[in-house]
Swiss-Prot record:
Keywords: Oxidoreductase, Plasmid. GO terms for biological process: lipid metabolic process; monocarboxylic acid metabolic process. Reduces deoxy-fructosyl-glutamine to mannopine. GO terms for molecular function: oxidoreductase activity. NAD(+) binds at residues 203-227. This is Agropine synthesis reductase. Substrate binds at S333. The keyword rRNA-binding does not apply. InterPro entries: His_Pase_superF_clade-1, His_PPase_superfam, Mas1, NAD(P)-bd_dom_sf, Sc_DH/Rdtase_CS, SDR, SDR_fam. Pathway: Opine metabolism; mannopine biosynthesis. The active site is at Y346 (proton acceptor). PROSITE patterns: ADH_SHORT. PANTHER family: 3-OXOACYL-(ACYL-CARRIER-PROTEIN) REDUCTASE, 3-OXOACYL-[ACYL-CARRIER-PROTEIN] REDUCTASE FABG.
Amino acid sequence: MPLPRAYLGTAQPPASVKEFYFVRHGATDLNEKEMHLQGEKHWGVQGAGTNIGLNGTGKRQAVLAGNVLRKLPIGSVVCSPLLRAIQTALIANIGFLCFDIDEDLKERDFGKHEGGYGPLKMFEDNYPDCEDTEMFSLRVAKALTHAKNENTLFVSHGGVLRVIAALLGVDLTKEHTNNGRVLHFRRGFSHWTVEIHQSPVILVSGSNRGVGKAIAEDLIAHGYRLSLGARKVKDLEVAFGPQDEWLHYARFDAEDHGTMAAWVTAAVEKFGRIDGLVNNAGYGEPVNLDKHVDYQRFHLQWYINCVAPLRMTELCLPHLYETGSGRIVNINSMSGQRVLNPLVGYNMTKHALGGLTKTTQHVGWDRRCAAIDICLGFVATDMSAWTDLIASKDMIQPEDIAKLVREAIERPNRAYVPRSEVMCIKEATR
């Protein structure tokens, strides 16, 4: 609900305001408190007189905001002096060595009500022992003069955001006012608009252990929203905790196309988009040409290593095309580039996976969707436990691969790298 004109009093937006960004601080414990008194809903009150820090949810929101902000053309940063706003700016790690503090970006002062509970009227109108709404609006309008410089980022509070929106004649939804949202205010021909920017959504298969788990952990730490697939959802819950606003789990069976379709549908329903797919799940049990070829095992290897990535690619491509910068990362193997052993099943299927990557790149190029092969040598996981060519401590670590995957996702369209070969033993280069 927009603030009424009477709330603003004589406050007016400054002249020559250019487009700017706004982030409401991450959540605090008071943000999450509410109660009913005599049948009326009351909310936790934290204004200029309450200087508390972010809770766990708020810190996570700041990390996600940072993922978005680091990709935007931020010109300068201006922050409220209150701890919850400063923490948000610091945790977001926007890339600025310093930023300005402006007292006028403080939240409205709620006087003796600070730290308690208040009814809707307290936030919508003048209320006993609270800062006058006109005086509050006047100082917010003064702070808005920073936006005379293009692409200024404000890190502030919900009340400040509502005043800015009212000054500019912009209607806000509940989604706009959520903690940690990155908002872009732009002036059109005759009016202002506001757009929400959210962090990318990445699907990762086989993410409950090994390389897949390391990939997911790294993406979470860098502010991505994830939809993770594994045979048993409970394994994902053990690995990453309960699902939440930014983390989604789904059953993924590489032999069951139905689970794949259901996963992609559920991810889109939750997040509204898909920005990237990491085909990580693989099967490495030996199918040896020197011995009797186990065709049942080979069939399973073919299905998991080739058919499942193909089906996931097919399902995700329409959504990836919509982003203009979709990414598919296939976790391949150096066995898809050369042959060092008689393990014909693994060698064949990994060569075939490379063919899928190349074909996907051919199909996706004009839609700005890139496919990348990351070809691994020996990685310190169960899949490499059989070799005596190199000690586990000298093998590639899962965390090394996770960083390469994130770099592949973040690399701009103008700098396509089709394949990364990752080695830990001396080999001839190709």
